[in-house]
Each structure stands twice: as structure tokens, then as C-alpha cells.
Amino acid sequence: GIQKKKLVTGATVQVKGDDIQKLNTVSALGALQSQTPGVNITQSSGMPGEGFNVTIRGLGTTGSSGPLYIIDGVTGADINNLNPADIESIDVLKDAASAAIYGSRAANGVVLVTTKQGKAGKASISYDGYFGVQNVYKMVPTLNAQEYAMVQNEGRLMDGLPAYDFSSLVPNWESYANGTNKGTNWLDAMRNENAPIQNHALNITGGSEQSVYSIGISYTSQEGILGKPVQPKYERYTFRLNTEHTILKNNDFDIVKFGENLTYSYSEKSGISIGNQYQNDINGALKANPFLPMYDENGDYHYALPWDVTGENPIALMKYAHGQNLTKKHNIKANVYVTLQPIKNLKIKSSFGLTMDANTYRSFVPVYELASNVYNKENKVTQQMYISSGWLWENTASYDFKINENHNFSAMIGQSIERSGLGDNLSASNVNSIF
């Protein structure tokens, strides 16, 4: 429900949509960072399209610590499918009293998202957009060839092995030894300077005293600052339609109202491997041998050096093993509701919400050989499909009243029926493909 802020006694935080828009972020959760006391928002990866981890008032469980998300009355919806320009406000319920109505699902807090609603009056059209470029403020320093040689020999001596004679192993060793040739900086080679990011949102609102509407259309695009030449990228298209209609009205209040909130989003994401230390392309670039050139004399990716036969080319491995993939996501979130107010301050509301997701993933790994232990003898094609849906039916009745001017009371009773986890998952792969 809705309460005046001065009457709320629970621990809540509200962030207005206008404040979120000003920060020019791809995700609304990114804009909430540093604006919500007691809420810790982190991102485990900076790859475009990656989500956020949210904990409210500290980590209190060994299981999932994420809060319950409710978008326009639909529980479990993904906030990353929303464009920040479509958000009217975000409320974070941090204590048990504020989130009690949601039961055990709200054990880690609740994030309530309200999208922009219609307003009576002439049609109003607004556009919000930005275009920018992204760069790394400071790259992680890596060892150059001279420093790498020194550390390698220190390690061999500690293991009781003879030091490498780099003058006989490395052509033009003198240029490395005197520091004029720094070798290959693999992390810098992955850097995508001036990676573009943009967002465009068009909103239309208007209506009459009986019916109001709000329409939103948006496009978001972001490229990764690391991953060249794979070029990680995230694109999202959204469409939103919110309407509300008054069927019967008294002089002082609306007796019968109904409305709907509909949001559709489509996104595409491609990227590199960002898993653990063994499946992480950036980690591979940090550890790679700077003596290894990126390309050989034929312009192909260079094979491992004879004296370092397991030291693969990290750029080639990133491109061949992890760089040819595409994830597509379709999401529909819909909610219809009716509100009855037979007498003033007695509100009876029934709402039905539906969420549907349809996701696909495709990847291709070609034949390659980069080192004695890093190779793929057969190409591989993988395809996955995931479809899921869920619904929620909620009914509430509330009554507000005052005793004198200083005592405000609100009583509410409600029930909900929810079904989630409906769907199918299909995965298939093949080697030696003919297409």
C-alpha cells in the first residue's frame, strides 16, 4: 500500500527515479550504490550485462542472501530487465516489520520497484538519452619481459633447478635485457579503448480523469573495456505499458478502478570467460609469458615457445575457446488489478501477476592448438534453451482511520497464491559439425 513518509515507522529507504536516471547506469541496481544506507551492492564481474549481488543489513545466511524483488506487484521479477528511465521509485524494506506481509520470502529484505504511471492531462512526450565512452582509469601493472625473466629464474633456483640461459633461448635477448623491448603486454592487448555505452528512452504519459496511461520504449547498449578482439557486448530493448481506469467514482474517492502494468524486454549478450582462476581469460592474460609474440611470421596466432611449451597465447585461447557465444533473453512481466472502495478508506484489491522467460544460448569452439597441453582436436557446437513462467494472485483488504488528529491506524488482511518454476530446459551439443 501507500503511506505518508512521516507515518512510516519501519526501516525503509526510497530512491526516486529521477535520481537514478541522473547517474547514467545500465542497471538500476548500479545507480542504487552509495544511495541506500545499510544496503551492500556489489558486482562480481564488470562484463556488460552482468548482474549485481545485493545484501541488506549484512550477510545473515549461508544460502541465498538476495532480497525479494517486487516490480509493480509481481514478485520474483528481474530488475535487470528494466531500463532505469522507466522507474518511478525504488523502496528498500530493511526490517522485519516493514516486510512482514511477504512472509519468509522477505527474510533478506524486500526491494519494491514502481514503474512510471500515467497522469491526467494532455499527452506529454519526454526523451532521455546519453552516449559515452568507457576507459580503464588504471590498468593492473604486469611484468615486462626483463622482470619476467628475473622472476622465472628466482623460482627455478628456489626449486633447485638451474636458471634459464635467456641469451640462448630468446632471439635478440640484448634488447630485452637492457629494457628497450618490453615484450607483449597481454592485458593491454585485451584493452578496448573508448568502449561505447549508450541509452535512449522515450516516455509518453497522459489521459483523462477516467483513464490514464504511460508508455515507455528504450534501447541500451554497452561494450566491454576488456576482451579485444572478442568484443563483449550487451544490448537491451524494452517496452512498457501502464494504464489505469476509473469505472465508478464518488465525490471524494474512487469506488471501482482497474489497471494493468506490462513490461517486455529483449536482450543479447556475448562475452568472454569470467569464471574461477582456471576459467578466466583476464587471469590468463595476467600470467602469460611476455616473451611470446601475439602473431607469428604468417600473421597467425603464435604457438607456445619451445622453452615454455605449456605457455599458451591467452588472446588466441580467449577467442577460440570462449569468445564465440551469444545469449538471448525474452522476458514478459504483466500484472492486472482491480480496486474496490465501497466506503471511504476501506480498500479491497485483487491483483494477478505473470512472469515469463525464454532464454537461448549458443556457442562454437573451433579446432585449435596453442600449446602442448592446450588444444581442441574437434570443433564443438552447443545450444541451450530455457523457458520458465510463474504467477501470483494476491487479495488484500485495508482500512485506515484516525482517532483525534494525532493517532493514525491502519489495519490490513490479505492472502496470496503463487506458482513458480514452471518450464523446461533443453541442452544439446555436437562435435565435428558440418555447418
Across the structure, where does each feature detected by a protein language model lie?
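An active-site-proximal structural segment forming one wall of the substrate-binding cleft
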Residues: 346
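Short, small/polar-rich motifs associated with maturation and membrane association
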Residues: 1-249, 254-258, 333, 427
